[in-house]
Regions:
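Short hydrophobic beta-strand that contains or immediately precedes a catalytic carboxylate
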Residues: 145-148
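Short N-terminal binding/cap micro-motifs at the start of the first secondary-structure element
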Residues: 68-73
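Short glycine-centered helix-capping/turn motifs at secondary-structure transition points
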Residues: 77-78
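Active-site-proximal loop/hinge segments that shape catalytic or ion-binding/gating pockets
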Residues: 2-32, 40, 48-52, 57-58, ...
Length: 274
């Protein structure tokens, strides 16, 4: 319970940052729209529509159906993060060591060191077995990773992590922070100012990628806001840099409460081979 309370403080901290700079963030987003779409556009109206698209986008958690442990999932009745599992399925045992370092900087955890719940959110480093040294550390203090799938990708919002996915209920988005890039990648650059919350989606629009080739987040949002048809590029949701909007869930993800739909890819199913 105390770990989850620390996670809520992280969410509140990021939201406070966005609230503090909300006027600056909105002006930055408006300038970008004006610069890239033309001054003759009603930039404020377009921005409001883009925010609405993001707030109404579906939230997905991708997984590989051939690798996920459904028995364990049903046993716990909730989706667990890599700290609770000990590592990310299919990844190196030291995965959480790097993840902890990135999260500590990206979410400014050191600024919450005076919190009474801080001991439950600090790993204290890792043992040779790659387990947190701190006995008070709680895996619930750290987020569950998802994607904001505003383009309704055939395989969810981050198919590089598996072509199957859970679609979560809309209310879960209120418990999230969002990044225009994977926080592990160099594009994010451990820059906390790029993070947003449900109430401050303008920050995503101000910072999202605008690549010339492949999936283009900014131009896709502009087209959707204008009511134009958007073709989903094949590299949407792939890679670990800028091809999807990353979400960080600071709440439990209960199977029978928070998951709206389950999509299983036949490419990952054992039935497709029989």
């Amino acid at each position: 319970m105390y770990g989850r309370l620390f996670g809520k403080q992280v969410l509140a901290h990021i939201n406070s940052n966005c609230q503090r700079d909300s006027d600056i963030i909105r002006e930055k987003a408006l300038r970008r729209i004006s610069r890239e779409c033309g001054a003759e556009m009603d930039c404020a109206l377009l921005l409001n529509k883009m925010v609405d698209i993001l707030q109404n986008a579906r939230l997905t958690i991708n997984f590989n159906a051939a690798k996920i442990d459904f028995v364990s999932l049903l046993k716990h009745k909730e989706y667990l993060n890599s700290y609770a599992l000990g590592c990310r399925p299919g990844d190196l045992p030291a995965y959480n060591v790097g993840r902890d370092s990135v999260e500590t900087k990206a979410f400014e955890l050191e600024k919450l060191a005076d919190s009474p719940y801080a001991p439950y959110g600090q790993t204290g480093g890792f043992s040779l077995a790659y387990t947190p040294k701190s006995r008070t550390f709680s895996s619930a203090s750290r987020p569950i990773y998802a994607a904001l799938d505003f383009l309704l990708g055939e395989n969810g919002g981050a198919s590089s992590y598996g072509k199957s996915f859970f679609e979560l209920n809309d209310n879960v988005k209120i418990n999230c922070t969002f990044s225009p890039f994977d926080i592990y990648g160099h594009r994010f650059g451990l820059d906390t100012s790029k993070l947003s919350t449900f109430w401050h989606m303008e920050n995503l629009i101000a910072s999202c990628q605008n690549d010339f080739f492949g999936y283009n987040c900014f131009k896709s949002l502009v087209k959707m806001a204008k009511g134009e048809k958007v073709l989903v590029h094949s590299n949407y949701g792939t890679g670990y840099e800028g091809n999807y909007i990353e979400a960080h869930i600071y709440s439990d993800v209960c199977l029978f409460r928070d998951i709206k739909h389950v999509y299983l890819s036949l490419q990952e199913s054992s039935y497709s081979k029989s």
